[in-house]
Amino acid sequence: MSGFLRWFGGNRSKDTTKDTIVRFQEMLALYDKKEEVLERQIAEQTEIARKNATTNKRLALTALKRKKMHENELVKIEGSRNNIEQQLFSIQNANLNFETLQAMRQGAEAMKSIQRGMDADKVDQIMDKIRDQQTISEEISTMISTPVGLNAEIDEDELANELDELQQMELDSKMLGAEKPPVHTPAVPAVPSQVKDLPSISKPQELDEEEELRKLQAEFSL
């Protein structure tokens, strides 16, 4: 098998293997056509022999001989076809195995190249460095977030005590306010803020009313 692989994959290019496979497939197609022709010829000679079996024995025997020749040729073609199919199957399997082996070899080389500069000790050293840097980063963040200046001098406990005192004073004030008796103020009716103006009578209207009054008095005097 190793020599077979070297012939198809080692010393020859991949194109050689592909060309061989294509060539075998073409031969199988040719054998298919040849078998169809021989089978048709066998059927034709069989029909000729049947038709002339009683009327023309000489022609019938000749047809049977040709039929036998075609049958023998068909057997040879079928044998050659089987051999080609077996070879093609073997070549395809060998090529598949070779390609698989090549892929596995390339994968191993790639892993070797990737891991060339790595081992357990180096990985452990790198992880230690990462942890150290993380610790330093946390310390820096803590230092940066620590108040400085006036804020750093403020006593949080003192502020809390002062706040408690203010809250107690507020509660005491509310309690004192609640103890005083409520003062009731009698309700005073609301005074209109503005008096509506009475309608004024115009002077012409007053003259008309006086005139009408005099007319009434004159009528009653009559």
Curated annotation (Swiss-Prot):
Any coiled-coil regions, as ranges: 24-111, 150-176
Biological processes annotated in GO: late endosome to vacuole transport; late endosome to vacuole transport via multivesicular body sorting pathway; mitotic nuclear membrane reassembly; protein transport to vacuole involved in ubiquitin-dependent protein catabolic process via the multivesicular body sorting pathway; vesicle budding from membrane
Membrane association type: Peripheral membrane protein
Purpose of the protein: Required for the sorting and concentration of proteins resulting in the entry of these proteins into the invaginating vesicles of the multivesicular body (MVB).
Cellular component, GO annotation: cytoplasm; cytoplasmic side of plasma membrane; ESCRT III complex; mitotic spindle pole body attachment site; multivesicular body
Subcellular compartments: Cytoplasm; Endosome membrane
Family: Belongs to the SNF7 family.
Region (Disordered): 178-222
Record keyword Metal-binding present: no
Keywords assigned by UniProt, alphabetized: Coiled coil, Cytoplasm, Endosome, Membrane
Subunit structure comment from the entry: A component of the endosomal sorting required for transport complex III (ESCRT-III).
Main location: cytoplasm
Protein's name according to its UniProt entry: Vacuolar-sorting protein snf7
Top-level taxonomic group: Eukaryota
Source organism phylogeny: Eukaryota, Fungi, Dikarya, Ascomycota, Taphrinomycotina
Gene: snf7
Basic and acidic residues bias spans: 212-222
